[in-house]
Amino acid sequence: MKISLVVPVFNEEEAIPIFYKTVREFEELKPYEVEIVFINDGSKDATESIINALAVSDPLVVPLSFTRNFGKEPALFAGLDHTTGDAVIPIDVDLQDPIEVIPRLIEKWQAGADMVLAKRSDRSTDGRLKRKTAEWFYKLHNKISTPKIEENVGDFRLMSREVVENIKLLPERNLFMKGILSWVGGQTDVVEYVRTERVAGISKFNGWKLWNLALEGITSFSTFPLRVWTYIGLFVASISFLYGAWMIIDTIVFGNPVRGYPSMLVSILFLGGVQLIGIGVLGEYIGRIYLETKSRPRYLIKSRK
């Protein structure tokens, strides 16, 4: 039985040898043929030469190097494109997702699950801000989007070959892999685990990238941000109508003069702000449509030297 590990890497020269040694020395994985697909996402350090050297000595190591930095989501998709295992497991090279969890994932898969999610029961290794923003994102996404995604589940999971082949059929270029992996469905099971500290290096995923990923997730799987502006427009129009009616009554019935520029200026600024926000939301969706219509490849792989 063949198990494929999909491992995106970006400037991870310190972590790769530790990860490789840990996988190959882990006794519970030795009964399986374990393929390791490294995806070098445009690293500037020795990452490329390290994974190429591993591939020379180990035929089950598949080294892929992008022509530039395309991002983690395209790297994950590239890994899925190039795996050959009966089951596929995306995993981070920093070993925050412990190798010891993999046999439990395999056990659930062999029991009949198409996808086995690895759920973090303890996120104390993440900062408080990251934990809270992740919690808010999951709640918002699952309230307005379909399908829902399991809270505290990252990319670390096991997928059957059938699930992987279904994912590869999807044509979109703007990728939110957590949503895509949930969208394909199938019989799903969950394994809980405790996330550990990184074995080496530092995280390359900063707050700005997380923010953009959250936007990608919401706009890829929900039209609610567009629909909500219809309701806002109706609300503002209703308030304006009622205020206008009150001004007429106040002037004709009570004889009060119409208030001048201050109220008008406030109204103009308020409506201008609302319109700009609405245009911004609309622009997010139009921008994604524009990128999709170009039909550019998700990634480019350079040949090995």
Curated annotation (Swiss-Prot):
Q: Which InterPro entries match?
A: Glyco_trans_2-like, Glycosyltransferase_2, Nucleotide-diphossugar_trans
Q: Which organism is it from?
A: Shigella phage SfX (Shigella flexneri bacteriophage X)
The family annotation for this protein states: Belongs to the glycosyltransferase 2 family. GtrB subfamily.
Entry's Gene3D superfamilies? Spore Coat Polysaccharide Biosynthesis Protein SpsA, Chain A
Role according to the record: Involved in O antigen modification. Catalyzes the transfer of the glucose residue from UDP-glucose to a lipid carrier.
GO terms, molecular function: glycosyltransferase activity
- The gene name on file is gtrB
Its keywords, alphabetically, are: Glycosyltransferase, Host membrane, Membrane, Transferase, Transmembrane, Transmembrane helix
Where does this polypeptide localize? Host membrane
What EC class does the entry list?
A: transferase
The protein here is known as Bactoprenol glucosyl transferase
Entry keyword Kinase: no
Q: In which broad location class does this protein mainly occur, judging by the first location in its UniProt entry?
A: host cell
